Amino acid sequence: SKEMAAARAPGFTAFGISMVAPVIMAFGTDEQKAKYLPDILSSKVWWCQGYSEPGSGSDLASLKTKAEDKGDHYLVNGAKTWTTMAQHADMIFCLVRTSQEDIRQKGISFLLIDMHSEGIEVQPINTLDNTPIGHHEVNTVFFEDVKVPKENLIGEEGKGWTYAKYLLEFERGNGYSSELYQQLQQLKA
């Protein structure tokens, strides 16, 4: 990002590179690393983030999107909202509830879901800053009986909260780092 800042290029939001890749590298299987990391690095596959849910505000642990164990796959039902660029995404990394526990964070798992799967619907959220008119960035993503292979589970079932906290170390600020670097250089000049 220093090179981009030096060239005065705008920052970018690459959910694959800046968010899910570190999680896959730290907690994914060798097969997941081989399958996903090359396409993330080349930007062949575009990712979006499925954390927030309608009616939950910033309380991620209150999530209701459920992934039911069906043997060789999960059956996912629920919705995610404020999902940036979901209309262009090939994959979504998603927090889902795989069990009901006394401590809500313990029943959460981290799944990688193909956005082209049957049962996924993306609806735009029109905001005041949609520019130009008719374009949007954020969406609600609905999951209705979406089959997700078990091999798309990152790490262990029920440990998604740990992986989500790890991801948040990379999420905040990455999109602005080149702009901040540019401003710092201007102040020094």
Locate the predicted segments by residue.
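Glycine-rich beta->alpha junctions and the first turn(s) of the following alpha-helix
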Residues: 15, 121-189
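A short core secondary-structure module
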Residues: 73, 77-123
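Structural signature of FAD isoalloxazine-binding scaffolds in flavoprotein oxidoreductases
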Residues: 59-63, 142
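Short Gly/Pro-enriched turn/cap motifs at secondary-structure boundaries
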Residues: 13, 55-58, 82-85, 100-102, ...
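Internal helix-loop-helix
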Residues: 1-34, 38-44, 85-91, 156, ...
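A structural signal for short hydrophobic beta-strand segments in well-ordered beta-sheet cores
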Residues: 65-68
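A short, Trp-centered hydrophobic/proline-enriched beta-strand micro-motif
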Residues: 43-51
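Short loop segments at secondary-structure junctions
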Residues: 27-29, 70-72, 97-101, 115-118, ...
